[in-house]
Amino acid sequence: MKFPQKTPLFSISAWVICSLLTSGCAQYASVSERRPNFPASLAADGGGLAKRLKAALQKRKSQPAAGLSSLLLEARAASRELATNPANSTARDTYNFSVARIVDTLQQAQLAPWEAPLRIPSSDGELILTAKKDSRPGWNPALYKFVPADQFDVHGKYVHEHSIKPGIGAPIVAIGRDKNRSAAETFSLPHIYYGVTAVIRFRGPVAELAFEDPLATETISFEGRRQPLSADFTVPLAVMLQEAEPKKFELARLLHPEKYAETARISRLQPYDPNKTVVLVIHGLMDTPATWTPLINHLRSDETIRQNYQFWFYSYPSGYPFPYSAAILRRQLDAIGKKYPIRKPMVVIGHSMGGCISRLLITDPGTELWKKIFRRSPNQLALAGETRSILEESLIFDSRPEVGRVIFVAAPLRGSDLATHWLGRIGSSLISPPRLLFKVGQEALQLATLQADELRLNRVPNSIDNLAPNNRFVRAINTIPMSSRVPVHVIAGDRGLGGNKDKTKPVQSDGVVPYWSSHIPEAQSEKIVSSDHSAHQNPEAIHEITRILKLHRAESK
């Protein structure tokens, strides 16, 4: 008889974590291209308009110029009707639908009016299609593939709310043709997926195509009056999510942080606007910036938020100990501040471990944190140059002057017992320490004298270790107050299972972070929402964040 071989502990541990990761996880975003539906007002039209549009769509397959001609004439007729009757919804729908199909035809036929005017014969004489010149960096249409937003079917956990804005123009997804090679120096995304709105203005036989930014422009000049600019805020985010596949990086960046070191950076989600307040979002353990999609998608549907805020995110390998991730963030803030000066106090929103990082942005420890960790001052310790540099950067720092408000969402500021639970210990043991931090950790372990009840390790602490309530750093940082200059807000999840708000078991919790760990007595506000640990995606929490952002705008005037 053959006995089954014993499964190595590593394999069991990996299986446990992977099982927890994949169970019950819906797809973040699923996108597929489809034939666009006629707007309801056009579908209901039984006359010549719908027939002419259908004929134009059929014609453009084999005769792009003829199809463009028909679509331009329909767009021009609708534009003229809107000049005299701007409330005519059928004319608006006809115009927007025609412009979307014109952009799609240009792409399919590989025609580029931004390179040279297109002369197009029509039943009403020759039409000349040109493109508006745009000198802004990155706004050269030749850099992008343009797909009308109404040609996408969008589903998924993170994009179930479809945020659109009615108005003039065809919402378009601009997809970068090549990798963005200036991403690091411009703090932008490595691959561009951005929502623009196509507008065609007619002057006699000339039709001028322009791509407007709906995050920068609320209204446009159209046929002699200001008109709201149409927008689709959801489809570009969904396309980006599907192409980026963030889910495959969540576990990988936790277990192998050194491999993904270059992903520790701030990135802008839109062109920099010095007149808008920055909202910097910071994700948590085993997560990516994709986790903020439901929040950003909803916030962009609010005109007040669009007009006054711009969104940046800080991404990092979540296997790093969070004091080190905070040190990298401070470096990034220094760098981005030189290129894009932050003129208004920014709002930082941190979820889970991202909240712990956020806390370090508004703390002034001086050398106090160092002394609490090592029981000696910095000049009393003999440390190698690189080790000393990393430890000083992580433990001796000032609060950030550009931060004007912080929102903590499900943040384990005093740790989580899950980090000391058997599953947390298994997860911690699977994280491969970066070589540089391993060396630093070995030297630091020899110098730190632990108390009897403190977390003991024979290796460098990682992110999970840094979330243990009995971790020395966690204990030390909680003896140092946050800056009274910066108002803070707390949003905590509650699964509705009852429990105590103090450490008396059973405790009130979101399933990961207990209330006693996230509560801040001096917070300007505290909101408990009916949620598990993903409180930042909860509708109640999103509503509360919207309220706080509007409060920040009002108080910053």
Task: Identify the meaning behind each predicted range.
Residues C25-V279, T288-P294, Q310, A554-K557:
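Flexible, membrane-associating and regulatory peripheral segments of lipid-active enzymes
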Residues K2-A14:
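Bacterial N-terminal signal peptides that target proteins for export
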Residues S11-S23:
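Bacterial N-terminal signal peptides
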Residues M286-D287, S318-G319, T367, P412-R414, ...:
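Short, solvent-exposed loop/turn segments at secondary-structure junctions
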Residues T293-Y309:
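Short amphipathic alpha-helix adjacent to the substrate-entry channel of hydrolases
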Residues P271-P274, Y340, R400, M482:
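Short, flexible hinge/linker loops that cap or flank conserved catalytic cores
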Residues S432-K557:
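C-terminal subdomain of alpha/beta-hydrolase-fold enzymes, centered on the catalytic histidine
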Residues S32, A55, K59, A66, ...:
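Serine-dependent carboxylesterase/thioesterase catalytic core
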